[in-house]
Amino acid sequence: MSDQLILVLNCGSSSLKGAVIDRKSGSVVLSCLGERLTTPEAVITFSKDGNKRQVPLSGRNCHAGAVGMLLNELEKHELHDRIQAVGHRIAHGGEKYSESVLIDQAVMDELNACIPLAPLHNPANISGILAAQEHFPGLPNVGVMDTSFHQTMPERAYTYAVPRELRKKYAFRRYGFHGTSMRYVAPEAACILGKPLEDIRMIIAHLGNGASITAIKNGKSVDTSMGFTPIEGLVMGTRCGDIDPGVYSYLTSHAGLDVAQVDEMLNKKSGLLGISELSNDCRTLEIAADEGHEGARLALEVMTYRLAKYIASMAVGCGGVDALVFTGGIGENSRNIRAKTVSYLDFLGLHIDTKANMEKRYGNSGIISPTDSSPAVLVVPTNEELMIACDTAELVGIL
C-alpha cells in the first residue's frame, strides 16, 4: 500500500459511501456504507481486508455524524495521516461547473447557491466537505459534479418549453444527474459486451433512493430523466418524479400549503414513501408487498411502470437500443424490480433470463438476458468512488 491515498466521500440523500483508495493500484484500502440515515435504523458498515463491522448510528444518524464515525475509523487504522486529498461527489454544479474542480470558498458559495436545485443532496455534499476541511486542514478538496456528463445533451433535449427570457436569466434548463455513475458504468458495460462504447446505443437505469435513466449514443449523454433539479423523472424513494406543475398552485390554493411546504412534500414525503405510507426503502416494500401490503404493492407497480415508460422513451434519444443496463443499489440487487420493469418492454425485444437475473446480484455483474436475445440486458455495479478518486488525483497532481 502506497502513501498516495485519496479519501472519497459520496454523501447521498439518505446514505454515505466512503472509501480510501490507493491511487497507484486503484484498490480500496477501507470503505464504509452508511444507510438509512436520518432514521432510527441508521447504521454504518466498515469494510477492511474482507472483514466487515456494523455500527449503529443512534444519536449520530446524520451525514455529519456518519462522516465523524468514518474519520474515527481512519485514525484507528492509522490511515488518517496518509490521506493526500479528499474527493467529493457534488450533486448539482449548476451551469458554472461542467467538470470537476478544486474546492475553495468561491466554490462553496456556488454550491450553497445551488441548494434550491438539489435540496436533498447538496446540503449532504456540503456537510461532507465541511467535515473533511475540519479533520484534514490543509489538504486539497475536489468536487466532482454529477451534472457534468450531461453537458453533451442536444438543445432539443435540455430545453424547457418556457419563455426564453426566463431560460436565459435563471439558467433554467434540464441538467441531469448521476453523471459520475454513468461515466463509470457505460465503459464497463461495453467491456462486458465486447464492443466499443461508441458503437452501442445504451440506456442506463441508475436506481437507488434517487433514480434516473440516461440515453447514451456515441459514448455521450443525449437525454436523461432528471432535469433542472433531481425531482424530475422516475418515481424515487421520497421524490415524486414527473408531476403536473399545476399541483403547486392547486395545493397552495386549496390545501392551505405554501410553496415551501409543497416543495418539501414532493421531495421528502412522496415517491415510494408517499404511495406506500410505509417506507422509502425498496427492500422493505418488496417484503411488505409479498406479505399483502396493498400500499407497498402499488408503490412498486407505479415505480416499475414509470421506469419502463422512460426506458421506451430513451430509445428515441438513442435511435434504438442495443443494451439496457441496471445499476445503483436497487438496480444492482433487486431481481424483482428488474424483471417487472423488463416485462413491460418485450415489444422492444427486451427479455430477462430468470436464472441469470437471480445470479447477478450483490456485486456480480453481467448479462441477464437470454443468450440469443437482442438487445442485451445487463447488471453493472457502479463505482462512483473510483471515478471521483481519479478526477481528484488528476486535479491535485497525484500521478
Swiss-Prot record:
Binding-site residues for Mg(2+), renumbered to this chain: 10, 384
Top-level EC class as recorded in UniProt: transferase
GO molecular function, one term: magnesium ion binding
GO terms, biological process: acetate metabolic process; acetyl-CoA biosynthetic process
Location in or out of the cell: Cytoplasm
This enzyme's EC code(s): 2.7.2.1
Cofactor binding mode and count: Mg(2+). Can also accept Mn(2+).
Residue positions binding substrate: 89
InterPro entries: Ac/propionate_kinase (IPR004372), Aliphatic_acid_kin_short-chain (IPR000890), Aliphatic_acid_kinase_CS (IPR023865), ATPase_NBD (IPR043129)
Site (Transition state stabilizer): 178, 239
S-S bridge residues: none
Pathway where this protein functions: Metabolic intermediate biosynthesis; acetyl-CoA biosynthesis; acetyl-CoA from acetate: step 1/2
Presence of the UniProt keyword Ligase in the record: no
This protein's UniProt keywords: ATP-binding, Cytoplasm, Kinase, Magnesium, Metal-binding, Nucleotide-binding, Transferase
Cofactors: Mg(2+); Mn(2+)
Pfam families: Acetate_kinase
Active-site residues per Swiss-Prot or TrEMBL entry: 146
Family: Belongs to the acetokinase family.
Known partners and oligomeric status: Homodimer.
Function comment: Catalyzes the formation of acetyl phosphate from acetate and ATP. Can also catalyze the reverse reaction.
Name of the molecule in the record: Acetate kinase 2
Species name: Neisseria meningitidis serogroup A / serotype 4A (strain DSM 15465 / Z2491)
